[in-house]
Curated annotation (Swiss-Prot):
Membrane disposition: Peripheral membrane protein
Subunit and interaction comment: F-type ATPases have 2 components, CF(1) - the catalytic core - and CF(0) - the membrane proton channel. CF(1) has five subunits: alpha(3), beta(3), gamma(1), delta(1), epsilon(1). CF(0) has three main subunits: a, b and c.
Lineage start: Bacteria, Bacillati, Bacillota, Clostridia, Eubacteriales
Superkingdom classification of source: Bacteria
Molecular-function GO term, any one: proton-transporting ATP synthase activity, rotational mechanism
Ion transport as UniProt keyword: yes
Principal location listed in the UniProt entry: membrane
Listed name of the protein: ATP synthase epsilon chain
Record-linked Pfam families: ATP-synt_DE, ATP-synt_DE_N
The UniProt record lists the keyword Ion transport: yes
UniProt cross-references to PANTHER family, sorted A to Z: ATP SYNTHASE DELTA/EPSILON CHAIN (PTHR13822), ATP SYNTHASE EPSILON CHAIN, CHLOROPLASTIC (PTHR13822:SF10)
Family: Belongs to the ATPase epsilon chain family.
Length: 134
């Protein structure tokens, strides 16, 4: 690792999604987007549903995270995400089906519908579609 990069690890309960040296990243913090360059001051923050943008050797990658925590320390960024997937791994048909289901639940407005859960499902689906370029 050079002094112009930092180690980024994104892990979920199921797997390690990303583990490489990167030059810059932007994470969806709960208080807004957070940019992290090498030698960033130590911090711990919570993450929102959103797209992480990662720069590595002049290329930009996207990883969808659905909440979790991020720690920055000693030129290493560790993301513990509830769920995460690289943009190229996203199954667009599955994300589109999830979007439709969430919209249908929200349109019903019956007492048995958990509105917050449906809104979060919709946000996850829309974020996945956006990351996939849809």
């Amino acid at each position: 690792m050079s002094d112009k990069t930092q180690r980024l690890e994104i892990v979920t309960p199921q797997r390690k999604v990303f583990s490489e040296d990167v030059s810059f990243l932007v994470a969806p913090g709960t208080e807004g987007e957070l940019g992290v360059l090498p030698n960033h001051a130590p911090l711990i923050t919570s993450l929102n549903i959103g797209i992480m943008r990662i720069q590595q050797e002049g290329k930009t990658f996207k990883v969808v995270v659905t909440g979790g925590f991020m720690e920055v320390r000693d030129n290493k960024v560790t993301v513990l995400a509830n769920a995460a997937e690289r943009a190229e791994e996203i199954d667009v048909a599955r994300a589109e089906a999830a979007r439709r289901r969430a919209e249908e639940r929200l349109a019903k407005k019956t007492p048995d519908i958990d509105v917050l859960r449906a809104e979060l499902a919709l946000k996850r689906a829309l974020t996945r579609l956006k990351a996939a370029g849809q």
